[in-house]
Structure formats: C-alpha cells, structure tokens
Regions:
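Long alpha-helical repeat scaffolds
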Residues: 6-9, 38-41, 56-60, 79, ...
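Alpha-helical scaffold repeats of the Armadillo/HEAT/TPR superfamily
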Residues: 6, 32-35, 72-79, 113-124, ...
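Alpha-helix N-cap/helix-start positions at coil->helix boundaries
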Residues: 48-49, 65, 89-90, 107, ...
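Alpha-solenoid helical repeat architecture
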Residues: 43-46, 84-87, 102, 126, ...
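Elongated alpha-helical scaffolds that mediate protein-protein interactions in large eukaryotic proteins
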Residues: 24-34, 42-44, 50-53, 60-78, ...
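Alpha-solenoid helical repeat scaffolds
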Residues: 22-61, 65-69, 75, 123-128, ...
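HEAT-repeat alpha-solenoid elements in large eukaryotic scaffold proteins
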Residues: 2-20, 46-62, 92-103, 146-159, ...
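Acidic, serine/threonine- and proline-enriched intrinsically disordered linkers and terminal tails
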Residues: 2-31, 132, 266-416
Length: 638
C-alpha cells in the first residue's frame, strides 16, 4: 500500500467461526482427511443447509494454519469459490467470509487461491450481484447481503495486493466501473464505502489503467467525501482513504492536484493524526473485562456488550485512519518520483536512488519537495504528529487489550501503527530540513529515543527492529551530511565509548534478518565516520573496534548485498586521509584484499537481487580495488 514497505506484513485475521475448539485444532491426520472429504461432499450438495454447514466447517479449519496445506492440496478453494454465486444469500455470505479469511493467511495462500481460479467467481459476483444492487430496508437478508459485499471487496483487495495476476484480471473486468457507485454515503453504509475505498487505495497505486478508470468514474464522489463534516472516527477514516485514492489516481504526485485540493488533503491527514491514540486506547481498556486469574475473561452481555463493541469499532476505525494517513504521508515524501514507472536500470535512476538514500552533495532530498508541500508539512506539524504514533499506550493498557479476544485486533493494530510510523519518520528525516527537526540536537534525540524502541521494547519484534534501525541510520545520515566536515556537531558523540555501542554490536551478531543487519552495520559505520572528525585515544579505539567488528561480520555474511554494505561502509569511514594511521593499525588494506574475491564470487552466485541491492553490490565491487590501491599507497608513505 505504501512505498515504504519492503515486504507485506501479515494482515489481521477476522474470525468467521464463533468457536475453535482444541479438539479441532489437534485433529488426527486421518480424521482431518475425512473432515475435508465431508466438506467437499457438502459443498457440492444440492441442499442449502448442507452447503452452509460445509462452509462453516471450512471456516473452522482455516483458523488453524496447519490445515492450510491440506485445504489447498485438496482443492477446496476451487469447490468453495463458485458458491459466491449461489442463489441462497446465506451460502454466498458464508463462502465470502471463509474465502476472505483464507486470503489473509499469507501471500503464498493468495497465489494458491489464484491457481484454483478464485478470480473467476469473484469477478462474476461483482458483475452479477453488485452492478445494480442497493440495500433494501425491507429485505430480511439486507445485513447479510451487505456483509457479503464487504467480504468480497476485502477478498478482492487481498488477492490484488498479493498477486499481479489478480490485478490483471481486475483490469479486464468491469469491477472498476462498478465500485465507484458504492462511494455514495446517501445510499450505502459507511462500512461499505470504507471497504471500497480501502480496496481502491490498494489497486489504483502504480496501476495506470486503474488510475484512469477511477479518475473518470469517481472523481466527483471522491471530492464529495473529502468535504464530509464531523470528527467521528468513521468520518475521518472515509476522508483519509478518499484523500489517499485521489493522490494515487494522479500517480502519487500530489503536486499535480489543484492547490486548494492539496490544502484540504494535508489538513485531513494532519487532523486524523491529531487524535490521541494512546488516550482512546486507555479509555477503551477501562471498559474491557479483565481476566479472572486462570486466563478466562467473562464477556459483557446485553447493552454493555453493545456499548463495548461500538467503542472497539470506533477505536479500530481511528487506528486504521491514522495508519492510512501515515502511509500516504510516507509516499508523498518518498524519494520515488511519480513518473518513474519504468523501473529501467538507467544511470539516472541509480543517481536518483543514491541521492535519496544518501543526500549527496548537489540537490538535497529536502529540496525535492515543492515549497507548498514543505510549508504544509511544517505548519501542520506533521513530523511531530507522526512521531507521536511511534509511542505505544502504557504497558498495562497493552496487556489488557491483548488479553481480551474482542480487543486483540486493536493490540495488533497498535504494533502495526508504530512500525508504519517509524518507516514514515525514516522518509520524513530525509525530506525535512534539519532546522525543522530541532537541529542536530533534535535529530540526535530522535536517534537515542528510537534506539530505546529498537533494543529495549521487544527484541523479538522483527518489524519493529527493522523500521527502528532504519530511522536510527537515517538520523545519523542527517547529522553526517549536515556536518559536512564540521566537527562542532560531532561533539555529541565525542564521549562515545565501546560500552555505548555494545548493544548494537551484539544486535548485529545475533540478528537473523538481513535488512536489520544492514541497518546496524551502516549505523555503526556512520558513528565511526562522525568520530573521525574528533580523533583522540578513546575515539580511535572505538573506530578500530568498529572496523575489526565489521570486517569479522563481513567474512561471516551470506547475503552479498549485506557484505557489499559492510565493505561500502568501511570505504566511507576510511576515505578521509586522517584515517591512514588507523587503517595501518588494523591492517585494513590486507583484510579488504581478502574480501574482494569473496565479494566477486558471491555477486556472481547471487544475481537475482532487487534493483537497489544490485546498485549497491555493483558500486562496492567496482570501488573496492580502487580504494585498496589508493589507501595502500597512502599507508606506504607513513
């Protein structure tokens, strides 16, 4: 959904089945086979109740991830999906719910569903049941039909987010001509409008054909939604999503929109982030039933249950709106240009990537944002509002939300919101002038505070660790390029001792995620580079230790692009002539000469890499021999 994501995080599952017993979860293999065969027989039966019962059992099996391979292998999707077109409303609803739940498991599951031709009945559902449908207040199945539509829209979203083939089929269908009619809040519920907006938000991004269709079919409806009055979470969510769809219809390049529309959109995003997420979650936790000790929580009943459900829905909508707002902001200030659709490996693209990543001399990343956008970011205090989302509610509040079944989704949303906020901060750091971030001291504080999240909050949370270390790296980059050889700003790090970086070094040693290792290696390298401007016995010792550590890690590294990052980091640190003595002390050129053929061999073995990693490996491979020759010559003259 956003350009800040390297991989798609797992979506939260919504349970269709009311109960999932331990007995079912531990079904023996032969019993499971029998159960699947029974489901297949029921789904292909003629009786409505029989088909409905089969779909309910299907939904219960989906709740246990261990059952998914057998569900896929036995072709349950191929049999269940056509029931989206069943004459019985209850059967369509059960089929939509089960398939939607299955699509949330993993991207690979969506691929398997596509292989079993799930898109044909999904497309037919929209063509046959959604083209002219409006909720009938007098219909007994009104709520059921509305829920079926929402589930089918969510299913479509999940498939398109995971599969390019699904996006292709979507473009060949009439679905994008049908969905805009569901943006009318006068006819359809806010739940339906929200589901459609969420789907469009995803399928329109980087999809020129979809952009054109939605622009011509839904422009007026989307602008109407921008002008909605009120601060209710459901209203803020609709307005935020509408803003995101409008931006995506112009290829992500918000500056092509009229100035008044840009102002309205930026104000909506800022207002959405002005709601205190920690406060509303704390208020909710006061109404959530607590565990009675053995782990059992007695759910409220009657009116109390309705009030709690309403509050949970409201908080969920608010967190969803804030996450969407953050993703939109991250994309606005992303280095990727809206018209850079071709993905050609041209030198100009590589130069742009280098500029965005490193803020090279010449045009700064912050100069690439148009003045009117920069003014909006600063006047609306966007950075502070996004940063606030990196802070979770109090620990006791999080525990209460996690323990109660009804609020577990909110607990997961809070963790996701924190991660997305950090990824957005990463983009904002390269976009905003350092003066508007509190100067060097302000950026240093961001580095310190983010370090607490990365190393102290939850070391097992890989998504948090990756996003937090990316922010720490970006913060040091900001300080480094602001410094430009001026040692004054580096006094912040002049007292840095080995004990201060032990957490980072340990983190690199123990880390199993290449992206996090890369961030940490680059980060300790930037620290060493900052210390080069303030050399003394203590800082020299720290630089040598960091150097030897990176060299040691480079020999152990399996991923060629992380190895290239480590080598590139050392080249950066020792490119200054003041480091010649230190380079001689750690025998840098001899050790890099040993790494050079290793890097070349790995580069030959691991050719299938994302574009930015290919650039990194290519740069390191070509620069290393020249650097070794240059540095060896310098050292020989000492």
């Amino acid at each position: 959904m956003g350009k800040i994501r390297k991989s798609k995080p797992p979506r939260a599952k919504r349970s269709l089945a009311a109960d999932n017993s331990d007995e079912e979860e531990q079904l023996p293999v032969d019993n499971k086979e029998n159960a699947i065969q029974t489901i297949l027989d029921q789904l292909q039966g003629a009786d409505i109740e029989e088909k409905y019962c089969g779909l309910q059992t299907f939904a219960m099996l989906i709740e246990n991830p261990e059952n998914i391979p057998q569900i896929i292998n036995r072709g349950l999707v191929k049999v269940a999906a056509p029931l989206l077109l069943d004459p019985a409303s209850s059967v369509r609803n059960a089929a939509a719910g089960a398939l939607r739940n299955l699509s949330t498991i993993a991207m690979e599951t969506c691929d398997a569903m596509m292989e079993q031709d799930v898109m044909t009945p999904v497309t037919c559902y929209f063509h046959e049941h959604a083209e002219s449908w409006v909720p009938d207040p007098n219909s007994k199945t009104k709520d059921e039909d509305s829920d079926t539509f929402i589930q089918c829209v969510n299913l479509l979203l999940n498939l398109c987010e995971s599969s390019d083939l699904a996006v292709k089929y979507l473009g060949q269908s009439r679905i994008l001509d049908i969905l805009p009619r569901y943006l009318d809040l006068g006819t359809f519920s806010s739940e339906i409008v929200t589901a459609v907006l969420q789907c469009l938000f995803v399928v329109v991004e980087d999809n020129p054909a979809a952009m054109n269709k939605i622009k011509s079919n839904a422009e007026k409806q989307l602008e109407t939604l921008l002008g909605l009055e009120g601060t209710d979470p459901s209203v803020l969510l609709v307005k935020t999503l509408a803003a995101g769809v409008i931006i995506n219809t112009c290829g992500g390049n918000i500056t092509t929109l009229p100035v008044d529309v840009i102002r309205r959109i930026m104000t909506i995003l800022a207002n959405t982030l002005s709601v205190d997420h920690r406060l509303i979650c704390s208020q909710l936790s006061s109404n959530v039933p607590l565990s009675d000790g053995p782990g059992k929580v007695e759910a409220p009943k009657g009116k109390a249950a309705q009030q709690l459900d309403s509050q949970i829905q409201s908080v969920t909508q608010m967190l969803t709106a804030q996450q969407s707002s953050i993703e939109i902001i991250a994309n606005i200030c992303s280095c990727e240009d809206g018209d850079d659709q071709g993905n050609d490996s041209s030198e100009s693209d590589e130069a742009d990537e280098e500029l965005c990543e490193n803020g090279d001399e010449g045009v700064l990343a912050e100069d690439k944002l148009p003045p009117e956008m920069m003014e909006a970011f600063i006047s609306l205090e966007v950075f502070d509002k996004v940063w606030a989302r990196t802070q979770l509610p109090a620990q006791n509040v999080m525990l209460i939300l996690k323990e109660y079944d009804g609020s577990q989704l909110i607990y997961k949303r809070l963790l996701s919101l924190q991660t997305r906020a950090l990824l957005c901060i990463n983009n904002l750091l390269s976009t905003l002038p350092i003066e508007n971030l509190g100067g060097v001291n302000g950026v240093y504080k961001i580095w310190v505070d983010t370090g607490k999240l990365a190393f102290k909050q939850d070391p097992e949370n890989e998504n948090l660790a990756e996003s937090a270390t990316a922010v720490m790296r970006a913060a040091l980059d900001k300080i480094k390029f602001r410094d430009s050889g001026n040692s004054n700003d580096c006094n912040l790090f002049s007292d840095l001792a080995l004990s201060d970086i032990e957490l980072m070094l340990t983190g690199i040693k123990e880390c199993q995620v290449p992206e996090i290792r890369s961030n940490l290696i680059r980060m300790v390298g930037i620290l060493a580079l900052l210390l080069v401007n303030n050399l003394n016995d203590v800082t020299s010792n720290v630089i040598c230790t960091i150097t030897e550590f990176i060299l040691e890690q480079a020999h152990k590294e399996n991923e060629v692009w992380v190895l290239a990052e480590a080598i590139d980091t050392l080249v950066d640190v020792y490119s200054e002539d003041e480091t010649d003595v230190l380079a001689a002390k750690v025998k840098l050129t001899d050790k890099l000469a040993i790494l050079a053929p290793i890097l070349k061999n790995k580069a030959r073995q691991q050719k299938r890499l994302p574009k930015e990693y290919k650039v990194l490996v290519s740069t390191a491979t070509s620069n290393l021999p020249r650097f070794i020759k240059y540095k060896k010559d310098r050292i020989s003259r000492l």
